[in-house]
């Protein structure tokens, strides 16, 4: 929430960075737009009064999710990668890279039966374990972006990436 991009994005719905983060209107009763849970506990949405909308945070509320459906966000991300590669870094660790894209319809994740609530990297009593995460991560668009990232990395011989992911079908 301290990044300049987010500060600009939250100020209005029509500024140049308005669509750089995942924003959504409240449901008619004022609650978050869907049932998505944060991996670190609680709902994955936080109300932003300046903008009058919720923003998505799959992790901490201080880590709002970039809107990778926006081509400008993808380009800016690749520009940042290029900056560091030009500086001579040997590679990048891609933390939770499968969380870049979300379902554009913001559909509710289906509930998971109690017997299936197994934590992979989180406690099984964390509400995050109570859902199948079909819509808040691991979307098909993610692979297209990773292909673009790989194409950039291939221009730097010897540079490597290490991606960290987890998903329902990861094992």
Where are the regions a protein language model picked out?
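Acidic/aromatic-lined carbohydrate-recognition and catalytic surfaces
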Residues: 1-82, 86, 99-168
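Hydrophobic residues within beta-strands of alpha/beta enzymes
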Residues: 92-94
């Amino acid at each position: 929430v301290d990044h300049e991009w987010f500060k600009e994005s939250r100020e209005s719905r029509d500024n140049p960075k308005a669509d750089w983060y995942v924003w959504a209107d409240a449901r008619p009763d004022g609650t978050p737009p869907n049932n998505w849970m944060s991996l670190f506990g609680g709902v994955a949405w936080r109300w932003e009064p300046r903008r009058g909308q919720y923003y998505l945070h799959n992790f901490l509320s201080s880590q709002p999710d970039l809107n990778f459906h926006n081509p400008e966000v993808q380009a800016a991300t690749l520009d940042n990668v290029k900056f560091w590669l030009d500086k001579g870094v040997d590679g990048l660790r891609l933390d939770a890279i499968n969380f870049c894209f979300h379902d554009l319809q913001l559909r509710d994740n289906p509930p998971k039966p109690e017997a299936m609530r197994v934590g992979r990297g989180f406690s099984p009593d964390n509400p995050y374990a109570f859902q199948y995460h079909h819509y808040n991560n691991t979307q098909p668009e993610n692979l297209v972006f990773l292909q673009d990232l790989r194409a950039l990395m291939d221009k730097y011989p010897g540079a490597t990436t290490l991606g960290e992911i987890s998903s329902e079908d990861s094992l």
